[in-house]
Every structure is written in structure tokens, then in C-alpha cells.
């Protein structure tokens, strides 16, 4: 991969990793509701889960989904259902941790990693990266370089969202503001399904 192509890949990785989507909206809400320290496993799960998804797509999973459209459809339905469930949980959350009794908890590492497999934006990012930046002459090396680019860019990008959420904790310590923030985050998370439904 040429230096120009690798730099373009880094820009693609940055833009797709830092723009709003299911992961970043959930991290914003998690930062608000649980703080940055308790959100770290969620952030790491996103980064590692996406890395595994990216490698799987680069090593042939994307071709399998193209060959079996029913599997792709089933994955979209499962992902959509799980995304709606998460949106509901966020929308119904009413208490900041440390501010009273709550059963709410941040997403665990393994849950965040597994979510990447049903996250529509993650699939689009992975398939597009491999289709555009993978080199047919050096397939394995180009897949590894794409994975490295996303690994370098993804964790700092998603951390921005969790950090911003944590910065909002003081403002959202008012229960009414927190209620409406969580409802808005739940609705926005559900709205990320719209491109998948087209």
C-alpha cells in the first residue's frame, strides 16, 4: 500500500470512527450515566470487537455474506432488534450511578465486542475499508495494514464520546435533564437503524 493510500485510509478510519453511530451514541450515554472509568471496558470492547470483525471481513467473511444473502438479512434483523433493545434501555435509564439505587450498569467488554457483529455501521465500515483499500496483489498484508490503521484511530475516537459524556455529568445531575437526555439518546440510537432499513 502506498503512503498516499495509507494516509487516505487513516482519514477514512478517523471520519468513520469519530462520527455519530450506535457505538458513539452509546458511549456518550455511558459517559454521562457511569463516568469514563466505568466506561473503559465498553470502549475497549468496541475497539477489539471491531478489529476482529474487520479481520474476519478482510479474510473472507464479506464474501460469505455476499454469497448467502439470507445470512446477511438475518444478521441485519438480529442487529436491528438488539439495537432497539439497547435504545430502550438507554431511554429508560433515570439515575446517574453514585446518585441512588440503580440496577443499570455500563456495557461489559465482551458485550461491546459482540455488539460489533450486529452493528450496521461497523459492517459498512469494515466492508467498505476492505473493498476500497485492500490490495489484491498483497491481500494479507493489506488486511493487516487496514486493521492497524483502525486500531490506531478507533480507540481515541470513541474515547472522545465517552469523555464528552463524562463532562456532561454535572449538568445532567438534574433528574429531569438526565431523563430527557437519555430519552434523546435512545431515540437517536434507534434512528441509526434508518440507513439499514432503506
Q: Where are the regions a protein language model picked out?
A:
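Hydrophobic/aromatic residues within the transmembrane alpha-helices of Major Facilitator Superfamily
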Residues: 14, 18, 51-52, 88, ...
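Flexible cytoplasmic inter-helical loops of multi-pass small-molecule transporters
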Residues: 92-107
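Juxtamembrane transmembrane-helix termini in multi-pass membrane transport proteins
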Residues: 3-73, 125-146, 151, 162
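Hydrophobic alpha-helical transmembrane segments in multi-pass integral membrane proteins
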Residues: 54-58, 117-127, 187-198
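Short loop-to-helix capping motifs
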Residues: 21, 35, 119-120, 174-175
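A short amphipathic helical element positioned immediately N-terminal to and/or at the very start
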Residues: 109-117
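Selective transmembrane alpha-helices of multi-pass membrane proteins
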Residues: 66-95, 154-157, 161, 171-198
Amino acid at each position: 500500500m502506498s503512503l498516499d493510500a495509507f494516509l487516505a485510509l487513516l482519514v477514512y478510519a478517523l471520519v468513520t470512527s469519530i462520527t455519530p453511530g450506535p457505538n458513539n451514541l452509546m458511549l456518550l450515554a455511558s459517559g454521562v450515566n457511569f463516568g469514563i472509568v466505568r466506561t473503559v471496558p465498553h470502549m475497549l470492547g468496541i475497539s477489539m470487537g471491531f478489529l476482529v470483525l474487520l479481520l474476519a471481513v478482510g479474510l473472507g467473511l464479506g464474501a460469505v455474506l455476499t454469497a448467502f444473502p439470507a445470512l446477511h438479512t438475518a444478521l441485519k434483523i438480529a442487529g436491528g432488534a438488539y439495537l432497539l433493545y439497547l435504545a430502550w434501555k438507554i431511554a429508560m435509564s433515570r439515575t446517574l450511578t453514585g446518585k441512588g439505587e440503580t440496577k443499570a450498569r455500563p456495557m461489559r467488554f465482551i458485550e461491546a465486542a459482540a455488539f460489533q457483529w450486529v452493528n450496521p455501521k461497523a459492517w459498512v465500515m469494515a466492508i467498505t475499508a476492505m473493498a476500497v483499500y485492500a490490495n489484491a496483489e498483497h491481500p494479507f498484508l493489506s488486511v493487516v495494514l487496514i486493521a492497524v490503521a483502525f486500531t490506531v484511530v478507533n480507540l481515541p475516537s470513541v474515547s472522545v464520546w465517552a469523555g464528552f459524556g463524562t463532562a456532561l455529568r454535572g449538568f445532567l445531575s438534574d433528574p429531569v435533564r438526565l431523563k430527557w437526555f437519555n430519552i434523546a439518546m435512545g431515540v437517536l440510537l434507534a434512528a441509526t437503524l434508518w440507513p439499514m432499513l432503506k
